[in-house]
Amino acid sequence: TAPDPTTFRDAWRILEQYEVARKVPASVRRRLEAGMKKTLPETPKAGAVLFRRVDNLLIGDNQAAVDAVVKAAKGKRLQTLVLSTTVTGEARELAKFFGAIAREIATHGRPLARPCCVIAGGEPTVTIRGQGKGGRAQEFALAAALEIAGLPDVWVAGFATDGTDGPTSVAGAVVDGETTARARRAKLDLLSALQDNDAYPCFKKLRAHIVTGPTGTNVNDLYLLLAL
């Protein structure tokens, strides 16, 4: 439905960049090599005949989702701050940043005074270190719970706009300053769970999941900090 500007050689360069070109299945390697030798056709590019009567219209994006959050927050008379609509990097590192902002708000009333809502959109990643179950939004929330532990009237949430975070049936999770205390009472070790990338079981037991079901759209994720 849309031209693909990438090539077989682009894919091969990425494999080489991460030093996995000789580790992928032989069938994948053979296909890429055939494409680079032009014995396999590239995907359709801009200017191809089949696109002459095709128009692609972008009717929604992460900016639209963030704008909707801002509108809803202002409707509740909250001050708002949008950090970015293109966040990337490790989900747990993003959580540390949100935690630092939460503590700055709680301690000094900046960059916003309460009541306020800090918003970011995008799609961070997770480097798999363990054998657990979860997704980037749940990993963000799990790490954030550790960062905001003890802060009163502060909530942090992360969720995927398509309603599916990683290989799970939930969109994400929401935590507050008391999440770690509730976890201890439930005999859950959140730090160990984070190290094992095992956010899903923790939030299931704490009943902290955000469950929307399939939303019919996908404009990356939303990450929120609410301080009242």
Predicted stretch roles:
Residues 91-100, 126-140, 166-174:
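Short glycine/threonine-rich loop-to-helix capping motif typified by GTGT followed
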Residues 1, 119-122, 157-161:
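Short beta-strand segments
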Residues 2-18, 130-156:
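Gly/Ser/Thr-rich active-site loops/lids in small-molecule metabolic enzymes
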Residues 2-97:
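Accessory alpha-helical/coil subdomains and C-terminal extensions
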Residues 60, 74-77, 85-89, 109, ...:
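A cross-family phosphate/adenosyl-ligand binding-site feature
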Residues 142-228:
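Internal helix-turn-beta structural module
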